């Protein structure tokens, strides 16, 4: 039952993100996004900065990610980032080529389990090899 609620919440955020970013326009890089959208903010000129595992906000890429990555306890670029922050042992990268960072999980199997519930099977291969 919890997975049904989670799936419904993910669909709601993804739909909301698609409509908000379409109305905002590509040049402004504002609005709600999902790291699972391709490209995440409607254009590859903007970056989706997660505030949760499946929802974030669009920003210009000029140094925003570096500061946000250091401040956010679950954003990571490597397993070492997760261990340093105390947020887990595995950095599960989003199965999206436009997202250059990941989310900290306790283990690789936990990341695979989460991503398998919300992404198409062909995208899951990139999580397993990251």
UniProtKB/Swiss-Prot annotation:
Q: Which UniProt keywords apply?
A: Disulfide bond, Knottin, Seed storage protein, Signal, Storage protein, Toxin
- Cysteine pairs bridged by disulfides in the record: 29-46, 33-48, 41-58
Q: What is this protein's tissue specificity according to the annotation?
A: Major component of both the cotyledons and embryonic axes of mature seeds.
Modification after translation, per record = The C-terminal glycine may be removed from PA1b.
Q: Where does the secretion signal sit in this chain?
A: 1-26
Propeptide ranges are 64-69, 123-130
Pfam families in alphabetical order: Albumin_I (PF08027), Albumin_I_a (PF16720)
- List the molecular function annotations (GO) for this entry: nutrient reservoir activity; toxin activity
Record text about domains: The presence of a 'disulfide through disulfide knot' structurally defines this protein as a knottin.
Q: Its biological function?
A: PA1b binds to basic 7S globulin (BG) and stimulates its phosphorylation activity. Involved in the signal transduction system to regulate the growth and differentiation as a hormone peptide. Toxic to various insects through binding to a high affinity binding site in the insect gut.
Q: What is this protein called?
A: Albumin-1 A
Q: Which organism is it from?
A: Pisum sativum
